[in-house]
Structures are given as C-alpha cells and as structure tokens.
C-alpha cells in the first residue's frame, strides 16, 4: 500500500489516503453515456506481472458480446507492441490508447470510466483514487501490500493460489483464469 500511495502522490503531486479520494478539476470528459467505458491496464512493471495481451483481447471481445462498450488502453510508449496488437484486433476499433498522453492528461477520462480491469499498476491505484471500481489482476505481486486497501478494488489471483497469498515470486501470469476475470468484470459492470 505504501508503494502505491507514494507512486500516486508522485504522479499527481497530492497526498492520498489508503482509501484514496483523488479530487480533480471538473472537466467535461464527453464520454457517451450509452456505452460502458472500460480502462484496460495492460502495462506492468515487468513481464512476470503482466497478464497476456491475448487475454485482454479475448476479455474485450467477450464483454463486447454482452455490453455496448468502449475500451481505453492504459499503457505507455514502452507498451507500444502490446497496444498495437490490441488496436489491430477485432475489438481495436472500439478503443482509445493512452500511449501518447501523460498520466495527468488521462485523469478526466479515467474519472468517467465505469471500470478498470488490468494488472496491478499505477493505473489501478489511480482509478481507485478517482472512485472507479478496479478489477485488478495480481500475477506476481502481493495483494496484502497492494490490493487490500480499498473497497473499490476487487482482485483476481492465479488459480491454485490461496486468496490474498500472491507474492513477488508467485509467477502466476499464465494461471489467471480468463473466465474468472470475465465473470468479475461483468458483475462489476452491472
């Protein structure tokens, strides 16, 4: 929690609590209310913490079959290959990438989304601070430290790992169930 708190504070230049409440300037984000807006946090601090991009594509395809939605791809210049793979997929036409925006520039959009689904990254923690529900995939980082501080954060862990017991050595990115993430995402969107 402490690392996520420091990261968020450094990015936004403000102090946040462990149940963060980030207040931003009110700006019109012009998000079409006839859609559900979902931020997909495909970025991660390392390959063992990153759920496979193909899972995000399949997740977006499945959600799109059930709900009219738009996707926002949270990643930066270091994630360009992943972003392009998503943009070139069948659901890519329904997405907007944050690749050329600073985190601060994404805040008006993030504030208006319905759900964050993604890896345990700064995007998840900023979303929670903006009072957005976050479905956070923990592949190889401790939920106890990074995912248990907010009622707005729902976590998914690798299959076979006891709830709340992921660590930095779990190495579970290939054991996170797409069906579990899909099921939780649909619950949070309804």
Feature names for model-found ranges:
Residues 1-190:
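Catalytic machinery of carbohydrate-active enzymes
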């Amino acid at each position: 929690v402490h690392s996520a708190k420091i990261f968020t504070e450094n990015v936004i230049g403000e102090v946040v609590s462990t149940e963060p409440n980030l207040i931003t300037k009110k700006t019109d984000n012009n998000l079409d209310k006839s859609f559900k807006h979902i931020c997909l946090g495909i970025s991660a601090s390392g390959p063992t913490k990153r759920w496979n991009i193909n899972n995000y594509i399949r997740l977006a395809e499945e959600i799109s079959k059930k709900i009219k939605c738009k996707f926002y791809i949270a990643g930066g210049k270091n994630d360009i290959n992943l972003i392009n793979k998503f943009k070139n997929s069948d659901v890519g036409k329904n997405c907007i990438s944050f690749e050329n925006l600073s985190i601060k520039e994404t805040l008006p959009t993030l504030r208006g989304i319905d759900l964050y689904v993604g890896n345990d990254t700064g995007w998840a923690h900023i979303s929670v601070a903006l009072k957005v529900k976050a479905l956070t995939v923990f592949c190889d980082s401790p939920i106890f430290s990074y995912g248990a501080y907010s009622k707005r954060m729902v976590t998914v862990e690798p299959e076979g790992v006891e709830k709340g017991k992921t660590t930095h050595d779990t190495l579970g990115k290939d054991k996170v169930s797409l069906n579990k993430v899909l099921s939780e995402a649909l619950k949070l969107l309804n």
